[in-house]
């Protein structure tokens, strides 16, 4: 790459896009990388502030920004996503399906710490829709050493930085607990909220059982729904430490493995996550899910719907950022 006065660059090959910005009208390239500069181009280049331009010199051990962006794109792109055409040195990745975005945080941090290159992505472990932008890649200068890009590629170790897990169909069973609902003292306002959240995914509710505060009956209800084919059971009510609240004990008595009873998220501290036979989630939902805009359930549900198992360590990491404040920035 060589810097040359624009008036002297006729016949030379541009090594980067030349962008024209007119506020409220356009922001686009007037000349693309690889364009051979003509006499007629000189006034246009000068009008966009280019008194000097970078032109290609052969024999360099360097990569142009577009070529480097392709390498970064290849490092990031997993299944079910596609790239946009390279433009002004940048490539973006777009989702081909609805699913759960996974990001290798360690690898993206290592690449971004190398300097002269960047990968910007959405938060991992969030639901995305088909057509959503997932990430963008580019280098900072116009050219970069080939050797440096090879070092960046080595960070990936044959695995892409991004992956997109498709949501799967779930047959859902709902167990509603509490004497107040069972004996018709109050209306069940929890189940409509649950069904509304499930409507964002490929789900069918195959049954609902209403139980009083009898832990043996709750356990029996959970197991009966699993026998009917439920591959996700949601239990509402009875999740606090009050003496009449028996849902955590009932879930434990199914034989399910308890991942965690309690999560460092507000609202949602009394959340319970367990897996029956290692693969069927049984979830105890605290009352806040019924009225709060964002809770722990909104963070866990996308992962459950993609069969992405959640660990106790991942739940513990929610403490930083776990104060929801009705925002959607916290993530697992």
Q: Locations of the language-model features?
A:
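Short glycine/threonine-rich loop/turn motifs
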Residues: 179, 206-328
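Short, low-complexity N-terminal leaders and the immediately following helix N-cap/first helix
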Residues: 1-88
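Conserved small/polar residues in nucleotide/adenosyl-binding loops
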Residues: 331-332
């Amino acid at each position: 790459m060589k810097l040359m006065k624009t008036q002297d660059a006729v016949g030379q090959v541009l090594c980067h896009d030349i962008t024209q910005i007119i506020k409220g009208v356009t922001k686009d390239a007037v000349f693309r990388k690889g364009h051979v500069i003509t006499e007629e181009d000189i006034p246009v280049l000068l009008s966009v502030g280019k008194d000097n331009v970078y032109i290609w010199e052969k024999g360099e051990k360097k990569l142009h920004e577009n070529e480097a962006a392709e390498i970064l794109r290849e490092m990031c792109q997993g299944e079910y996503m596609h790239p946009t055409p390279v433009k002004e040195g940048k490539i973006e990745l777009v989702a081909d399906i609805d699913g759960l975005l996974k990001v290798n945080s360690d690898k993206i941090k290592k690449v971004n710490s190398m300097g002269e290159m960047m990968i910007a992505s959405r938060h991992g472990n969030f639901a995305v829709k088909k057509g959503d932008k997932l990430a963008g890649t580019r280098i900072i200068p116009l050219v970069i050493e080939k050797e440096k890009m090879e070092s960046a590629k080595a960070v990936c170790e044959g695995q892409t930085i991004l992956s997109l897990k498709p949501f799967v169909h779930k047959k859902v069973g709902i167990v509603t607990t509490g004497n107040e609902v069972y004996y018709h003292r109050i209306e069940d306002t929890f189940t409509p909220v649950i069904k509304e959240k499930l409507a964002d995914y490929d789900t069918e509710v195959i049954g609902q059982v209403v139980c009083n505060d009898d832990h043996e009956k709750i356990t029996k209800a959970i197991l009966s729904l699993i026998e009917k084919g439920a591959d996700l059971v949601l239990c509402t009510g009875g999740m606090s430490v009050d003496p009449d609240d028996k849902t955590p004990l009932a879930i434990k008595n199914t034989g399910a493995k308890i991942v965690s009873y309690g999560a460092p998220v507000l609202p949602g501290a009394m959340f319970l996550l367990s897996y029956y036979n290692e693969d069927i989630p049984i979830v105890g939902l605290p009352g806040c899910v019924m009225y709060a805009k964002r809770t722990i359930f909104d963070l866990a549900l996308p992962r459950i719907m993609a069969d992405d198992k959640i660990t106790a360590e991942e739940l513990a990491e929610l403490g930083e950022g776990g104060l929801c404040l009705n925002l959607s920035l916290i993530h697992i």
